[in-house]
Each structure stands twice: as C-alpha cells, then as structure tokens.
Amino acid sequence: MLNYSEQSNKGFRFTSLYYSMGSVNFDDETRSVISDVGDIGNVDFANDASCYNYDPSNEGPIVVSVPFPLVDGKPQFVVVGETIFNSVTIENTSTDAVTLWSVEIYDSKPKDSFTLSVMEPPSPGSDEEYIKSFVESFSLEDRTLLPGKTLTIWLSCKAMVKGLHTTAVHFTVDDDKIERVGFVMVEDKISRSLTSNKPYNRPMRNKPFIPKIFSPNAGQKVIRGSRPAKANSRPRKYRLLEYKIPMAIREVIESKATPDSLVEGLTEKNYVPFFKTLLIMEEIKLEDDMRTYDMQNITFKTKGRFLTLEVLGLAERRPSLVTGDIIIAKPASHNDHNMSPLYKGHIFRVEAEEVLLQFHEELHSFHSEGDRYDVQFEYNRLGMRRLYQALEASGKLDTEFLFPEFSSNERLIETRPLVPISCNLNEEQLSAVEMILGCKGGPPYIVHGPPGTGKSVTLTEAILQLYKTKRNTVILVCAPSNSAADHLLGRLVMENAVNIRKEDVLRLNATARSVDDIKSEFLDFCSFDQEDTTVFSCPIFEQLIRYRIIISTYASAALLCAEGLPSGHFTHIFLDEAAQASEPETMIPVSHFYRRNTVVVLAGDPMQLGPVIFSKDAESYGLGKSFMERLCESKFYKDGDQNYVTKLVRNYRCHQHILSLPSELFYKGDLVSCKEDDTLYPLTWKDFIPNPEFPVLFMGVQGVDEREGNNPSWFNRIEASEVVDVILNLIDKGIKSEDIGVITPYRQQVLKISKALETFVGSDIKVGTVESFQGQEREVIIVSTVRSTIKHNETDKRHCLGFLSNPRRFNVAITRARSLLIAIGNPHIICKDEHWNKLLWHCVDGESYKGCFLPEKEEVGEGECGEQRSYGEWNNKWEEGGEESSGAWVPSGDWENVNDNGNDWGVEEETGSKQNEKEVESREQTSYDGWKENEMKNKGEGEGEGSAWVPSSGEWAM
C-alpha cells in the first residue's frame, strides 16, 4: 500500500520514489496510483478524471498544469508523422524558494514518443540559429524556483503510429513528487476524413402527448384513408381475429406486477397463457416505443398524390417505421376539447428521412402548405395477431411434442440404408438424413448444425430424398427470412441429380415483398396476383393442394392456414434456422399443420444468434429463447440421443486455427476442421501477418469512442482507418474485394467504414453487423470492436461491455472467415470479457499479434463481467447499461444508451438487440452504398388484412 502526503479524487501529490501509473480499488472506487515499475500501463482518460483534472488547492505550494488538456473529453488530435507540443507551467505559490530537482519523462507509450525542452519547439517560420540552439531530451536538470514565480517548459509528442500516445511526466520538488499524464490521439488522412462536424446531442425520448388524439371522445369522428395497394388482399377462408389486449392484464403489466400466468414459469399446463402473456408484454413495449415518433405542430409537404413527413434520424430509430404502419393526424389549431375529426392514414413508402403518407381524400383536399398538425404513429398489429392465433392453435398439440421430457415412451427410429443424392455427405450428415426419413411423427427431430458444418446440405438431401423416393410426401419448408428461404430453394432446384418439376414447388411470398428482391430464376416458382403481375399472391386452396414442396418464411406460412390447408396436410415440416425464431413464431407453421404422424425437423444452432425481443421483461421470462433451444435443454436432446438429435461436427469452412477457439468455447471441442489446405493464401499474406501458418491476427489499436449529432451509435475513426489500411494491403496482395467482409457492432461504424472504403478503395466490400453476416462467409473477415474505454459505473459493472459481452455474437463474428480472421480493437478493453480475452491470447500464443502494447495476461472468468446468462438472457439484453427511460434503438443492431455518460444499453450494441437480415428484406430494404444492411427487430402489425411485420422474425405476413 502506498502512502500519500496529500490526496484528492482529482489530483495527487506523492511522497514515494519514481513510480508508474496504475489503478487500485479503495472502497469500491478506482483511483490512479503510482507503482514501482517504470511502466505507466494503460491509462483510460475517459474513465479516470484524476489523469487530467485536479484542484490546485490540494496540490500544495507547487502547482503544475496538465499537458495536452482534453478537448470536449477527448485528447487533442495530430496527424501521424507530425509533432505536437504543449506548454507546462510549474508555479511556486509559496513564500519560499523550492528546488525543482528534476523533470523527467517517466514512461511513454509508444516508447520515446514524448520529449521535454525548456525552449518552445521551433515552428516552420523559426530562424536557423533558433533551430540549431533548440535541445530536447527525456529529462531536465534541477533548478531553483523562486517564490511566486512560474517556470514554463514544453512537452512534445512525435506522432509515431495511429492511436493513443500517452506519457507520464514526473516533477521532483524538494521531497515530493508530482505526476502529470498527457494524452495525444494520432490519426491519418483517412480517419481525419471521417471527422464529424456535428457535436453529439443526447436525443430525448418523446413522451405521449395530446391523449385525446389517440383516445377519441365518444362520438368523435375518425376518418380512415385507404391502405397501401399491396395490403389489399382478397378475403381468406378463415378470418383472423383481433386479439385485443385485455385491459386487466394490460394494467397488471404496466404496473410492473407479475401476471399470474408467469408465476410458475412455463409448464405443460400453462403453455398457451404463458406465451400469450409474453407476447402482450412485447406488444405493450412496442406501443411505448412507437411513441418516440409522436410529433406536434408539424407540417406536411405534397408529393404527387401523397403527403410527406420528415422524420429526422429515421434510419437510426427502433422500431422502424415501415409501409403499412398507421398515422393519426389532427389539425394543431384544434384544441383537445372540441370534436374535430381525427384522420387515420397509412405509410405507403419509407425513404431516407421522410415517409410518404396517404389519408382520406378529405384531408388531402383541404390541406395547404404550411398547415400544422399533431401526429401519432401506430404499428400494424397483423403480425402480432398471427402469433396469438398460432398460440391458440398450439393448444391442441400433444404434450410429448411440446415437452418431450414428459413422455413415457422413448422414440426408436428404424433406419434403412440409402443411396445419397449428394456424393459429399459425411457420416453425421448421412445419419441425420436416415433418421429424418425413418421418423414417423412424434417430437421434433433436431439437426444441430454449428457454423460451416453443412446443415443446408443435410436439409437439402433429406428433402430431395423424400421428394424422389416417397411419392406421397408433402413438404413445408420454412426459414426466418426471405434470403434464407431463397437459399434453400436454390439448393433444391440446382441439384441436377433430381429432376424437380416446377409445378411441384411453390415459393410463397408475402404480397409486400418486392418482385425485384428475388432472383429472376426463382420467379417461375412464385405465384402472382392475377390483375397485377408485379405483386406476389398466395394461391387459392385448390391450387395449394397440388404442390409437393412449399417454401416460405415462418410468418408467411400463416397464409396457408388462412387459405384453408388443414392440419396434417404436410407429411414433413422443415424449419431452418429454428434457433433464430421465438417459440410463438415457430408455432405459426407447426400449430396449424402438425398432426401426430407429421415429421417436424428443426435445424439450426442455439449457440448463434436467436430471436430479437424488445421487451426485456418478456425476454427474461423466455420469449428470447427459441423452441429449438428449449428442446436442446431437455433430457433426450441434451444427452445426444440419436433418435432425437444429430450434431454435425465436421466444419468445411474455417481454417483449423480459426475453428479451434469457438469449438472449445461453444461446442465442447467437438468440431473438426475439414477445410482443404490452403496453398495460395498463406503465400499471399506471408508478409502481412506475423505468422502465416496461424491465420488469426489481432491488431491492437487504442482509438477513441465518438458519437455525433443526435445519433447514440458509437464509432471509432482510428479503427475505421486501420480497417481500410488492412483492406488496401490485402487487395495489393491479390485478394479479391468480394472475398473480404467487415463486421462491426455499431451502425455508425458501419457507415464510417463504408464511407472510407468508397473514398479510398472504391471496391464493393460488404460491411455490416454480426446479424447481417449470419449464414454468410468470406475468405477474409475483419472485425472492428470499436470500444476503447470502460465507464466505471454500476451499469457497466452489471452488464460489462455490451456487444463484447454477448457470447453468441462473438461466436458468429469469428466463424465467418474461411482463411483469415483479423480482429482490430483495444486489447486493454476487450480483455475484460472472457471470450474476447481468450481470442486475444489465442493470437498472442500463436505469435500473431501486432499493434499497441499488451495488458498483463489474466484469466477472466464469468465473475468479471457479472453472472453469465443463457442465450435467451444474453441476446438483446441490456448490455451496456443506462436507464430504460433514455434508451434509443440504433441500426447497428444495438440498443444504445443515450445517457450523457455514453453507456450503451439494449440488445447489440451494442447489442440491445440486433440487426437482422429479416427486417431489411421484408420491412425496409435499406441499402448502404450498394449493399443491404440487415436491420433489427420486429414489430407487430395493424388492423385489417394488410401486410404486417411479425415480431422476432422480421417478416411480413398477410
């Protein structure tokens, strides 16, 4: 323990010998201290105010200024290769002379990057004699400081490399020592080009206003406009009920009390009310989140037959506004006590920062430019109603199907040898196909497919075998997103060994999907509206029963029920990426079409990304856990009984050194790398990575976290620049741009990197969040972790580092690379998380680290970041703290806190929930610089038989 002659929480004066900067905990407070090793270690300027802020009254008679004072909480910036200097004053405020024995650079990071001088460093205009007389060194000689006098010296920083430069300067005054720490952030032209000219302003969460505009008075007129054309569909055989939220349960949930249906947890007896209550929680949260769009005294602009409304920051908000959502408008000049009508319209199109609206013609006829309105948005509830309907239908399912652990009869599947259609099946894949073909109903059969193990190949083989060898089979294939469903269709129809007739296969699409969104070669398998061939439609019952294979999203499967297809119509139901869907979403295809003899196959990986949930309460009770994950926790599946589950373990994607860490952390070391040896790539980057035989590189960069405008999403310009440098190097060595992908947790970092690539590279390289890369792969993956500081508050102690602390996101991120994985980040920050810490030292041990100095190697356990949670708890969790009342959704796929302290909360990102391929395809079709960025979260839908968003899948239903 060190002794202090004087101490404050903002500055220190020391009586010990030369020491280095570190940190020690005192009564739960972290304070800067000095230790006896000549190494200042990592100093977090954003976290420890004592580094740069002090009270002169606590300093004693000698007052030393802080070099390179922070500007707006950030270090001063300088371009790499240049030198920046700053004066340091040493003032004697006493009445006695004091001896300044020495001033020394105690330590610098990078080494020797700071120097001292008694002369101001020369400028470009200095004369030659001054330049020759200038001397700089790492220490200054002793001198006497007279009473009331001030000595000015100069501290210079030579910008050696990009990133944070730090120094500790020691002043020995009589018997005391004073330390000052200086920070300089070094950038280059790339990072400087990404500088924001918009200071960050914390966005405020809007609250409901004008209550009577949302709750019409008795007799108050509501004038409804027409719905978007695509939402107008013909009547279905079965009408969907409203499923309005009962007022009693709404009051219980809004009072934060626990509903009776949740007290016992999920049981076989309360299945339906349990999940209906969780959906109500989710819907109430969505209602509340939609209030962020409420606006007063706004104006509409006319655009053709539409009115437009500017919605600033539209792309950054969650839940997002989409076509089909509802808007209620009221002239602002009318007070709340009159009975003026309310105008109810719909969103017809969503653009960058405006929405196109259409109301009843009455409003359009009297509207004039400059008229003022109060408006509120409502989400379309149709998707939620589909989920309620599916849950009600699940009441007829067998208990042994939903809860196989309660079954007294263990299943025994009889298999027969088969002739593979694909000659490349391995032992586990072949076994899974044989089991599926031998199933005769009962509990779901699970194909657990970790990254790169050929899950799609296995499903395709099973479907083709059924189609070819069992003529009476009728198959429903569902995936969580349009792209995933299209991928399965492509695999089926491109298998030349089986001649699939076009009239046997239907690719069912929601009417809201754009025809331009699907590959032209798949259009022959789709159904279109008879009057408008640019609009998808669902065939009528008489046509549906002729198909042997129907492929759709989970949500669109509800169309089949609406057309009257009965339970038991399908002999086999295949649910791909089942771990990404909430349990109610899974019930859409299952509860409507399962009978005792129906074979249900769930394929996916519970150790990767799961469903996206807005309500943290609903998520904590189990809505964030997929049906597949819940089954995997039960007896037969957990024990690996081959009559219930097959685990694929042979990975054909990743190099063995890329695969070894996720295999150890998430799959009990079972995964086996079967990737063919690379002969080209190690030679290609042998001069780029320290160890060409170990293609997992960690590049240590101490950048700075920044935000801009009213956007709470974080970005790190220094890391963005490093990403561009790496890509330029790789392309120079012959790597194709389409073989490179960049993953980063924050939407703003996605945009910054995309902008820099467009400016300095010009190639089409995909940049996106983890969610946008699930199911995809690249030869080279670069991960930018962004965060460069930790805030020591209670929220961070509970929730750690947000994105960095979500194990499933980590797993997906590091398993997208086939041949080379490069992680770029601050090692002193990422080492606080158990999994990222292991990746860091995995690289160090493999002699594949370069960059800034490393932290001390420590084993980081679960306790470091708080109690580890199951995926259902981790996914979309409050990850970086903050208060719920100030949360805002950002497109990076994360809930980001909009508190001034900069902590994130929510799901990605930092992970307050995530971005996901689902919404981009079905809801917004957002595009950045030529590529589609997946977006996050799902919303319910509105009244009528229009198109709607299904929560957790991000799909449109009709």
Task: Give, region by region, the residue ranges found by the protein language model.
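Conserved helicase motor core of SF1/SF2 NTP-dependent helicases
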Residues: T469-N472, S481, I500, F541, ...
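Short acidic low-complexity segments
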Residues: Y130, D142, T534-Q543, K766-F773
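Short alpha-helix capping/helix-loop boundary micro-motifs
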Residues: E136-F138, L307-R317, F536, I765-V767
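ASCE P-loop NTPase motor cores of helicases and related translocases
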Residues: F209, E354-S552, D670-D732, E738, ...
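Short, charged beta-turn/beta-strand-edge "cap" motif at the junction between a beta-strand
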Residues: C157-V161, A332-H337, A557, V786-R787
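Feature for long, exposed domains in two main contexts
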Residues: M1-K285
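Pre-ATPase regulatory/linker segments immediately N-terminal to the P-loop/RecA-like helicase/translocase core
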Residues: L164-T166, H170-L437, L489-G490, K502, ...
